[in-house]
Regions:
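STAS-like cytosolic regulatory interaction modules
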Residues: 1-57, 63-102
């Protein structure tokens, strides 16, 4: 199995937000998981305005982070609509908050 190429994606904490940039793809999801999870406490927003594209692995990363945030009592909002996000949310029937409807 081929190893995904290094990604240009990165993440930083800014107040109550996790701010993502670059392509959220398979390589990014693997690279960013530990870093994002370590910064998740108190997050209310996922800022995607500097994300260039999202694939299914990137969506899985965001949805899992959102689930962890909800479990801690937050209701994270998503800001920005990178290429691929809306189509994948529709395909997986996710709400705008990256949750499965009840």
């Amino acid at each position: 199995m081929a190893v995904p190429a290094a990604s240009d994606a990165h993440i930083r904490r800014d107040g109550d937000a996790l701010v993502f940039a670059g392509a959220l793809d398979r390589a990014a999801a693997a690279a960013l998981w530990v870093q994002a999870a370590a910064q998740l406490a108190g997050v209310q927003r996922f800022v995607l305005t500097n994300v260039t594209t999202v694939d299914s692995a990137g969506l899985a990363l965001l949805a899992e982070l959102a689930a962890h945030a909800r479990a801690a009592g937050a209701v994270p909002r998503v800001e920005g609509q990178p290429v691929g996000l809306a189509d994948l949310q529709a395909a997986y029937r996710l709400t705008p908050e990256l949750d499965f409807p009840a």
